[in-house]
Amino acid sequence: MNKEEVLIITFKSIQDVLDLESKTKNGRMIPVPSCVKAGCGMSFMSKDLDEEKWKLFLEEQDVLYEDIVRVNF
């Protein structure tokens, strides 16, 4: 089975994940993978690996996030 690299955005609260999900269709909400630590049990996964673009988007949209990591999923 081939694994695909994805970007995981983590959050401190479920409200922040829902906030991002309502502002973009470029990914989806998933449970935090076991290899990632996060304050909230849910995260946002995207196949768009451009971390800088995501950081800029999150800042522009006033979405609070904890971390952005790459994971083979």
Name every feature range the model reports, one short phrase each:
Residues 1-73:
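Positively charged, small/polar-rich N-terminal and surface patches that mediate targeting and assembly
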